[in-house]
């Protein structure tokens, strides 16, 4: 047996029905779409319509809401700032602001829409005296920065 001699078994592959190709084809004239109406026209799909049964979107309960006044924070840790200082992306002499963190690549903040909050996870031995001007700080982060001789503006 050779590759060019391979073929399907009889009846294994059925040719698809070509619609709207004349009355003799069995699917001619209206092409299985019925007569007139929205669904007989081209390019129409009624989104969410399930043929008269209650659609899925109505069967499921409404849940939750989006609070308008919720503040969305970009969260960074003290060790992220330490890494940027060690790499030379940030300077310890300058006041560290949200804009400088974005420039250094510590925070991904498009159009400065989100606020920046500083946490102190895994950072118990912070010693750099920094001056920071961010939107929010955790209580532990405040203590660590003030113990190291830093300022929160």
Curated annotation (Swiss-Prot):
Region (Disordered): 21-41
Keyword S-adenosyl-L-methionine: no
GO biological process: translation
Source organism, top-level taxon: Bacteria
Record's keyword terms, sorted: Ribonucleoprotein, Ribosomal protein, RNA-binding, rRNA-binding
PANTHER family for this protein: 50S RIBOSOMAL PROTEIN L15, LARGE RIBOSOMAL SUBUNIT PROTEIN UL15M
Family: Belongs to the universal ribosomal protein uL15 family.
Summary of subunit composition and partner proteins: Part of the 50S ribosomal subunit.
Protein name per Swiss-Prot or TrEMBL: Large ribosomal subunit protein uL15
Source organism of the structure: Rickettsia massiliae (strain Mtu5)
Upper classification of the organism: Bacteria, Pseudomonadati, Pseudomonadota, Alphaproteobacteria, Rickettsiales
Name of the gene: rplO
């Amino acid at each position: 047996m050779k590759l060019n001699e391979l073929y399907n078994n009889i009846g294994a592959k059925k040719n698809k029905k070509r619609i709207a190709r004349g009355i003799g084809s069995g699917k001619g004239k209206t092409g299985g779409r019925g007569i007139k109406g929205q669904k007989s026209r081209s390019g129409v799909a009624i989104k969410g319509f399930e043929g008269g049964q209650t659609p899925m979107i109505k069967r499921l309960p409404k849940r939750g809401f989006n609070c308008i006044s919720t503040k969305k924070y970009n969260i960074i840790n003290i060790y992220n700032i330490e890494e940027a200082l060690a790499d030379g992306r940030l300077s310890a002499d300058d006041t560290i602001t949200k804009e400088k963190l974005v420039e250094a690549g510590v925070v991904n903040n498009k159009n400065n829409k989100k606020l920046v909050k500083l946490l102190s996870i895994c950072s118990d031995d912070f010693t750099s005296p920094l001056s920071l001007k961010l939107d929010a700080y955790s209580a532990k982060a405040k203590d660590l920065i003030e113990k190291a001789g830093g300022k929160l503006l």
